[in-house]
Every structure is written in C-alpha cells, then in structure tokens.
Amino acid sequence: MVGEPKIVSVWQFPFPIVTGRHLPYCPGNCAAHLNYEIAHQLLFSLSHQPRSRILVNRMIFSSPAWVPSPDQSAPDQVPIGDYVLSNHVLSKNDAPFVDAISGHVYTMAMLRTRVESLARGLAADLNWSPNTGSPEEKVVAIYSLNTVALSGPLLTIMYKIDYFILCWAVHRLNGICMPLHSTCTSAEITSHMITASCTTIFTCSGLMSTCLEAAKELQLPAEKIYTLALPSTYLDNANLEDSPRLKTLEQLADQGSQLPQLEPLRWSAGQGKSQVAFLCSTSGTSGRQKLAMLTHYGIITNLLQMSAFEGFANDTYGQTVAAAIPFSHSYGILIGHVGVLRGESHIVFPRFDMQRMLGSVASYRVNRLYLVPPILAVLGANSFLMEPFDLSSVTSVVTGAAALDRTVAGRLKSLQPSWEFLHAWGLTETCIVVTFTSKHDVWYGSSGSLLPGCQLRLVDAEGKDVENYDQSGEVYYKAPNMFVGYLGDHESTISSFDDDGWMRTGDMGAIQVSPNGVEHLFIRDRIKDMIKVKGMQVIPADVEAAMLTHPAVADVAVIGVPDELAGERAMAFVIRSTSVMSEFSEDDLRDSINDHLEDRLHETHWLGDRLEFVAEIPKSQSGKVLKKILREKAASN
C-alpha cells in the first residue's frame, strides 16, 4: 500500500471491519484524508481473494473475504415487525414509507401506533388473542395492491400505506400472513386458502371481483372479508354496487384505537426459528404454485446479511428508494423490511406505472431503484421514455427475480452513466436473497457474490460436485435462513434437501472469477427447463441470448418439445420488433432468424420450423417467463 502514490502512510487495524465508513477516521490512512472510496478500493483489491475451500471432495463457495459478518445475531424470539420497528437506528430519517400518488408520509411513530390499533381491532373482530390459539389457526390472506387510499373528513382523501402494517398486526397476534399475487386467479386463491386452512382475507376494490368469486367457492361469510380502498384510477372495472358491504381496515384500526392494550406476545427462546411469518406462493413458472413457509428468524437473518454486505458501501443508508415491486412477492417483502431497518424512505406505488415511477424519481430525488429486468429492457429499447425526467439522483439500480441481459445493462449504462446495475439472486425458498453485487465489482451477466453466512455447492448431472470455475451444475445452498418447507406438501419438502441438509435450488449455475479476482455466481437456467437433444443438454437461455442479438427480435422464450429422432428439440416463441424488418413476412423473418442462430450455435440449438411469432410472452409479476403456459400452448398445437 505504501507504494501507492496516493498513500502517505498506513495505519494497521483488525480486519474485517464492520463498515468502510470508519476508514476516514484512521490517522494517516490516506493523504489529506481523501474520500474513503480510495481506501475502499485499495482495501477491496487486497482482500478480494476467493474464500472457497475444498472439503471432503466438495468445493464449497462462500462470501468474499472483504464482506464482514453481520454486526449482530438475528434474534430468535422476536416477530419481524417488532424487530424492524425497534431497530430503526441506522439513520435519522423518519419517513420509511411515502405514497407516490399523494406524498403522504408515514413516520415511525405512526407505524407503531397503527400496528397496535389494527391488532386490537383484529383481535376483537376475530376473537383472537396474542397468546391463545396456534399460529396455524390465525392465517390471514392478503390479496391487494401495495397502496391504499381512504376517505377522510369532509370527503377528503387520506392516503395510507397499510400492507406491512397489516402484516405486522397479524404477527402481533401470533398469526401468519399469506400474501397473494394480484395476478392470482380465483381458483388459485381458493386452492391456497384451503391448503392454509385460511378463513380470513383482505382485498382491495381493484381486485374485488376475483376475491368474491373465490369467497363464493369457499363459502366464506362476508364478515371474514375486509377491504383496503384504492384511488379511483385503480378501481376494478366490475360493477361493485352489488358487492356486500364489507368492513374496511380503517374501521378495524379506528375500533382498535378505542380498545385497551393487548397483552405482550410471549415467545420462548428459539421460537422465531420455527414460527412461520409468511406463506409465500412460489412463482409456478414450471408447474403449480406451492406455499413456502418463511420464518421470522429467517427473514431477519436475511435483512442482516444484506445490510452487512452493503455495509461495505455505507452510502446506502438513509437513501430514498423506489420499487416497482408488489409487496405480495418475496422480493417485495424483503425490500420493504430492509428499508425500514436501514432508515430508507420508500416511495410506494399501488402497481407499476412507468411514467409515474420516472416522475417520482425526479420529484423525490430517488437514489435507488428496485426493478425487474423486463422493465429495464423496455427502458433500454425506448430511451425517449426517460428524456422528460431528471434521473440524475439515481446511483444504483437493483434487479432480481429474473436474469438481466448484459446487452440491456450496457445499453442503459451508456444512457445513464451514473447508474450502477446491481443484480441479486435468490428464491422464495432461500429466504430470500443469496447473492448481491458490490458496486466495486459490477460484472454484467452475473448474479453477484454470496452474502455472509451463505454457502453454495454446484452438483453436476451425475451427482458429483463441480470442482472447477466456469463449470455448470445445480446450485445447492445452505444458510441459517432457508425456508422450512412447503405447507401441505411433505414430498416436495423432502425432495428439496439432500441428506446433509443442502437445499436443491433447481437452478443451473456456475462460479466465475471476475477481473478483480472475486467469485461471482452466474445462473444459467432452471434444471426443469433444460432441453435434452440427442443426449446433450441445451440451455434455453443460451438460445434466447443468441436470438436477442437479432435486430428483429424484441423478446423471446425457448422451451423443449418432444422430437421423435432427437428426444427433444428447442422451440422459440418470438415477439418481433415493430420497427426493424417489419416489411418481412413471417416466413422470411423466420429464415433470417434461423440463419442468424445457426451461425452462432451448435446444431443441437437450432430451431428449424419450431419458431412461432406471438403478440406477448406470459410472465409473472416478477418478470419470470411462465413456461408451463408455453408448454401447454405447444402441446395444444
């Protein structure tokens, strides 16, 4: 370090340190106490050596050496809401949630008061008490958008953000929350509520008709259905005049504010490790949705892992963030909780609206965006959408839930040079984030590096551990915060783990070392989506990536279909560009795309006539392609 021209002298200190923000206060650390980023970069370069180790013929990967362990252990006898509301000490910021439509702000004091009032109202209405009855008897489904609006005095509109308040109120009563995606059908709602033995649901006017259809099937009485109101622009198109008059969340909270205090929740030591906080439905991209059980301890552990990883870049604390993510998704659950813990201001949208989101960035001087790759793909292909707005406040864009194409990231980086694209990877079952990208080692195409406390192995098709970099295998995962199983599906739970307690993620991945010498995870594809052509594995993502380099391909999804000679072959569903080669007939464009593909990939990846042009590709809210729907479509043809 002394050989570095910017360094005058070196102060030796124990490593790892908790956060890099302590560096400027080390005497003699940098000439004239230069910005700590210089010291960060030097520290990073000296401590980046991979920490993987070979153990009993297993190559076990862990977090980089420069990532500190969390500075506290996750408590195991505290509900998640109590934890984040009582540990909001990382910033003086006191506006954890801001409604994007109205600008209404919830302070920490308001959050605590409203959680307690709502819990009292729920307890009275449902005849629940904190320490009586099992959690499994207190399951509450939430089928709602993120933001609610309530009529106030003199017909004014008071905007409130009650999604997490409702979750924490249920937890205050020792209950379990079951978030349901707004895209759920009435049949899916019915199935989940039967599986969870759930007889209480909260919905909103924008989703009312689907909820009532499910309630009718379940023979659910009206007094077990509660509502969250919405701004008029988000109302359901259905005629709601014939709907039953349902009690609102606001009425419950008002009722509870007049009631005596609840008794404290009494948990025994270790209860948080087994107590389920959320029943989260899996994406269902390859099959039916299942309900993954996530514990209070597991989610709190992940919050601390995320905070420790980003402690290396401490300017994330107290920032303003905007997320186009539904709170019903595990990704949204994590973002909401970590923001409160770290003292961030979270700009909340009822549902995604591109223009409203970009306008909010300018209005609230947003520093970080949480997005999914399909949204970024739209921005990259339509830069004019960003032109009316001042987006200079944004310094980082966090993506997850699906792969971020490196071409899209590079294009957006050229348009917005101040944006760093930080990709993360995880599953609902891993509770929740496993890898994250440091802003000091951004590598497009990767999913980042492992969080502290997380371990990873790669297992090939023959069941042998991968022992080399850049060699693919199924990702096996172990950490203190894995899910505890699928509700009502013992067989799937058992098959998710090997005999040593490693979780099979179902994702195919590889570890590569970045130019800075840091191990990164690259996710190739889902194991279930792999295509076996003449005994050789074909990764659909490889075919998709090659096709996306054709100028006339706007989007594509590839699946495997049966083939009499090869066993399986790749089939592609393509959305064609509206502006490039639009004069081509479908047959001519199909020939052009096939020529393009055959110039780049082996014959096992070729399509032939198995290329279908479609108007849209079915995707989940998080941007994952619903390949089961495409398989059904291919089979019907």
Curated annotation (Swiss-Prot):
Positions contributing to ATP binding: 282-290, 423-428, 507, 526, 624
Region (SBD1): 353-423
Region SBD2: start-end pairs: 424-486
Source organism superkingdom: Eukaryota
EC number: 6.2.1.-
Alphabetical UniProt keywords: ATP-binding, Ligase, Nucleotide-binding
Practical use: Beauveriolides inhibit selectively the acyl-CoA:cholesterol acyl-transferases (ACATs), leading to blocking the synthesis of cholesteryl esters and decreasing the cholesterol concentration, which suggests that beauveriolides are promising as potential lead compounds for antiatherosclerotic agents. Moreover, this activity correlates with inhibitory activities of beauveriolides in the secretion of amyloid-beta-peptide, which suggests that beauveriolides may be an attractive new candidate for the treatment of Alzheimer's disease.
UniProt entry tagged with the keyword ATP-binding: yes
One Pfam family named in its UniProt record: AMP-binding
Functional pathway: Secondary metabolite biosynthesis
Domain comment (free text): Both substrate-binding domains (SBD1 and SBD2) are involved in the substrate recognition, and are sufficient to confer the substrate specificity.
Function: Acyl-CoA ligase; part of the gene cluster that mediates the biosynthesis of beauveriolides I and III, cyclodepsipeptides acting as inhibitors of the acyl-CoA:cholesterol acyltransferase. The HR-PKS cm3B initiates the biosynthesis of beauveriolides by iteratively catalyzing the formation of the linear polyketide chain. The ATP-dependent acetyl-CoA ligase cm3D converts the polyketide carboxylic acid to a CoA thioester which id shuttled to the first T domain in the NRPS cm3A by the acetyltransferase cm3C.
The family this protein is said to belong to: Belongs to the ATP-dependent AMP-binding enzyme family.
Protein name per Swiss-Prot or TrEMBL: Acyl-CoA ligase cm3C
Gene behind this protein: cm3C
